Structure formats: structure tokens, C-alpha cells
Curated annotation (Swiss-Prot):
Enzyme's top EC category: transferase
Origin species: Buchnera aphidicola subsp. Cinara cedri (strain Cc)
Function: Catalyzes the addition and repair of the essential 3'-terminal CCA sequence in tRNAs without using a nucleic acid template. Adds these three nucleotides in the order of C, C, and A to the tRNA nucleotide-73, using CTP and ATP as substrates and producing inorganic pyrophosphate. tRNA 3'-terminal CCA addition is required both for tRNA processing and repair. Also involved in tRNA surveillance by mediating tandem CCA addition to generate a CCACCA at the 3' terminus of unstable tRNAs. While stable tRNAs receive only 3'-terminal CCA, unstable tRNAs are marked with CCACCA and rapidly degraded.
EC number(s) from the headed UniProt entry: 2.7.7.72
Top-level taxon of the source organism: Bacteria
PANTHER family: MULTIFUNCTIONAL CCA PROTEIN
Residues reported in the UniProt entry to bind CTP: G8, R11, R92, R138, R141
Family in the record: Belongs to the tRNA nucleotidyltransferase/poly(A) polymerase family. Bacterial CCA-adding enzyme type 2 subfamily.
Remarks, miscellaneous: A single active site specifically recognizes both ATP and CTP and is responsible for their addition.
Protein name according to UniProt: CCA-adding enzyme
GO BP, one annotated term: RNA repair
GO molecular function ontology, one term from the record: tRNA binding
Disulfide pattern: none
Catalyzed reactions: a tRNA precursor + 2 CTP + ATP = a tRNA with a 3' CCA end + 3 diphosphate; a tRNA with a 3' CCA end + 2 CTP + ATP = a tRNA with a 3' CCACCA end + 3 diphosphate
């Protein structure tokens, strides 16, 4: 039995970037029970993966794969003792991830991964690459992860990604798996690259059809900005916001705000000016389909629906501002305001004079600070109301207090 360090740990070390986790492959083991005898814990259904009792790192048995179905899970695995290290590495996605190291520290590189690291190329190991649709998302993620180092996708690899998409195998990926890879893509230094790659290989059409639909469309906004591509501009904005915050909820919701501009409000006097349902509910359908976590979904939903209201928060009535605070439940979740402050970056209608100083967000936080202490508990001590009476009277008190403080707000901000 031999054990080798494989994959990302070696790649990252060769790139001189921090090693996040280490994975191992076990070659030549006759009976998987030998691992259990050494106190490893077995996980995984399709093939045995063992967790080290002390380091908690993953040890996988060397294996080969044979396509026998569709999607990411349609494979038969052979993890018998005759499987060699080279056979195991050959099934991996990229050459830069198919490098191994033995116990003496010797690097084993059957597929020229080191050479591709030097050339900064993301290249598939073999043509079996095309059998797993998840690899389309993985390569998009690696492109985003390593783009700041100058890495790019090899032409033949991109062609195989397009081939996978043309076979419609992406449709067999579970929403959970799509979101997991997207989450990782959003966590990189350049998350906009993730979506650009998905579009370039036609994967966006299957994974995010709502975004893909608007990718090439241009829109008339005003006399100063006659035509703009909303999605591509939003990707530029996503790149900018990613330099300011690592919060993926902010990054993703910030990017998706372009949906608001797809459907211009027909009449400024309508209630849509407060919360614009049409783009918000289009987004909501996508969020539900992809089973995106509730907290992330709510932030995206609020930012899109309340986009215009928040862009004009300085002229809103006290009643509407308190109503907004109630809807987003800021009394129990004040951190949501810390996510909303980034809205000041994103305003198509002021592209020429954008200072990006978070003025609107600061104003919003200041407004909340003036009335946040008017809580249910403090109110109950002074009033003897019950049930809905408490809610209604508390709301009236907040609105009245806010009206009285409006002049103070203007003086402090300006």
C-alpha cells in the first residue's frame, strides 16, 4: 500500500499560494477494511473515502470511472488494488490538478501539470473530461480562482466544455451542486470570470437562463446613456464590488440588480416605485429553482425590488421608510443594513458622476440609528397594549419620531 498527496495542495504550493486543504490517494490496498482497522472513518456511497482519525483529511482509494448513465453521478467505479496511480490521476479534470507527491517528497507528473502551471493554462487531462458535466462549472471556478495570476482555458478544453453543454447533460446536475460551485466561484477574487466562462461555453443557457437571456441585450436608459448591455456592465460592477467585500450574499445580489433595469417602471406615481414586483419575482423564480439558501435569496429579493426606493432614500417619506424597515425585519436583523450600504455603488442612471462613497448606505444606517431604540420591549413597559394594538401603536410612534428627526438627519448628513 502506498499513499500519495494529490491535487490542489501540490498545485497551490507550486503557485506559491496558501494551501487550503490536502487530499490523499491510497494505491494498492487489497481490502478497504484495512483503513477501518487503522481508525479511519469511511464516508461516501459511490466509492470509499476515508477520513484520517487525527488530521481529518480525506484519503480516497485509487480508482477508475466508467460512464454508465447521465450527469455527474452516472459512473461505475473500480477501486480494486490493481488500479495504478497513473490511472487514478488520468480521470481528474485538469493537468494542474493531476500531480502527485510520494512520501519522500518526489513530484510525480504524468500529464505535464507543472508545465501547464508555468504556462498558466487550464487544460483537460484526457477526453474522458467530457463525460462529467460538473467539470464545466469546476473549470469556470478555477478560471475565476486563478485569473489574477494570468491563467486561461485551453482552446480544446473550452471546445469540450461546449460539447458537454450541447449534449444537455448540465440539465442533470442538482440545484444544490450548481449552487455549491457557484458559491465557490463567488468566493474567488474575480467572480465575474466565473459567469463569463459559463456564457462563453453556452452553460449559462442551461444553468442561469434568466441571466443568459439578457446577456446580449442592450437597453435605453436615458439621454446620457442611450444603450448599455446590462449583464456585461453588471459583471464589471461585480468585479469592483468584489474588491470591497468578500460577502458572497452582497456580491451575488449586487450583480443581479440589473434585473431591475430590464423592466422600466411605466409610471412614477405607481406603488411599484416603492417595491417593484415584476423584476423581483422573476428573480425569485430563479432563486427557488436553484434552491439558493433563504438568507441569500431574501437579500437578493429585497435589493432588486427596493432598488429604486433605496436609490432615492433621501427623499422618501417617513411612513415608507418605516414600512421598508418593517418588511426587511431590520429590528431583528440589523446586519442587513450593512449589506444594503453597497447599493450606492450601483446606479446606471448616474454612471458619469459616480463617487462610490456609500452615501446612500450611510444615510440609511443613520436613519435607523435614530429610531432603533424604540423597541417592542421598551414600548410595552410604557404602554399597556396587547397583540395587534402594540404593533400598530409602535409603528405610529416610530413614524412620528422619525418625522421629528428628519431635519436633524439632513443637517448631520449634509
Amino acid at each position: 500500500m502506498k499513499i500519495y498527496l494529490v491535487g490542489g495542495a501540490i498545485r497551490d504550493r507550486l503557485l506559491n499560494i496558501p494551501v487550503r486543504d490536502r487530499d490523499w490517494v491510497v494505491v494498492g490496498i487489497r481490502d478497504p477494511k484495512e483503513m477501518l482497522k487503522k481508525n479511519y472513518q469511511q464516508v461516501g456511497k459511490g466509492f470509499p473515502v476515508f477520513i484520517h482519525p487525527k488530521t481529518h483529511e480525506e484519503y480516497s482509494l485509487a480508482r477508475t470511472e466508467k460512464k454508465n448513465g447521465v450527469g455527474h453521478t452516472g459512473f461505475l467505479f473500480d477501486f480494486s488494488s490493481r488500479i495504478t496511480l497513473k490511472e487514478d490521476l488520468k480521470r481528474r479534470d485538469l493537468t494542474i490538478n493531476a500531480i502527485a507527491q510520494d512520501s519522500s517528497g518526489k513530484i510525480i507528473d504524468f500529464f505535464n501539470g507543472k508545465k501547464d502551471i508555468q504556462k498558466k493554462i487550464l487544460r483537460h487531462v484526457s477526453y474522458s473530461f467530457q463525460e462529467d458535466p460538473l467539470r464545466v462549472l469546476r473549470i469556470a471556478r478555477f478560471a475565476a480562482l486563478l485569473s489574477h495570476l494570468g491563467f486561461y482555458i485551453a482552446k480544446k478544453t473550452l471546445s469540450l466544455m461546449k460539447l458537454i453543454c450541447s449534449r444537455k447533460e448540465l440539465l442533470y446536475l442538482t440545484p444544490e451542486r450548481i449552487w455549491k460551485e457557484t458559491q465557490k466561484g463567488l468566493s474567488t477574487q474575480n467572480p465575474h470570470v466565473y459567469f463569463q466562462v459559463l456564457y462563453s461555453c453556452n452553460a449559462l443557457f442551461f444553468l442561469f437562463p434568466e441571466i443568459n437571456y439578457f446577456y446580449k441585450k442592450t437597453y435605453f436608459l436615458n439621454s446620457f446613456i442611450k444603450h448599455i448591455n446590462l449583464v456585461q456592465y453588471s459583471l464589471i460592477e461585480l468585479s469592483k464590488i468584489s474588491k470591497v467585500t468578500k460577502d458572497i450574499n452582497i456580491r451575488f445580489s449586487y450583480f443581479l440588480q440589473f434585473f431591475y433595469y430590464v423592466y422600466p417602471i411605466p409610471n412614477i406615481g405607481t406603488k411599484d416605485y416603492f417595491f417593484y414586483k415584476k423584476p423581483a419575482f422573476l428573480l425569485k423564480k430563479m432563486l427557488i429553482r436553484l434552491k439558493i439558501p433563504k438568507e441569500t435569496s431574501e437579500i437578493i429579493f429585497f435589493l432588486c425590488g427596493f432598488h429604486n426606493f433605496l436609490q432615492n432614500i433621501n427623499i422618501q417619506s417617513s411612513k415608507l421608510i418605516i414600512k421598508f424597515f418593517n418588511i426587511i425585519d431590520v429590528w431583528r436583523k440589523p446586519n442587513r443594513l450593512n449589506q444594503l450600504i453597497y447599493l450606492d455603488f450601483y446606479n446606471f442612471n448616474s454612471l458619469k458622476n459616480k463617487k462610490n462613497d456609500f452615501f446612500l448606505g450611510k444615510l440609511l444606517k443613520y436613519m435607523f440609528s435614530l429610531i432603533k431604540d424604540i423597541s417592542v420591549c421598551s414600548f410595552i413597559k410604557e404602554k399597556k397594549f396587547k397583540g395587534i394594538e402594540i404593533k400598530n401603536d409602535l409603528n405610529r410612534l416610530r413614524i412620528q419620531s422619525f418625522k421629528e428627526m428628519k431635519e436633524k438627519i439632513i443637517l448631520n448628513i449634509f
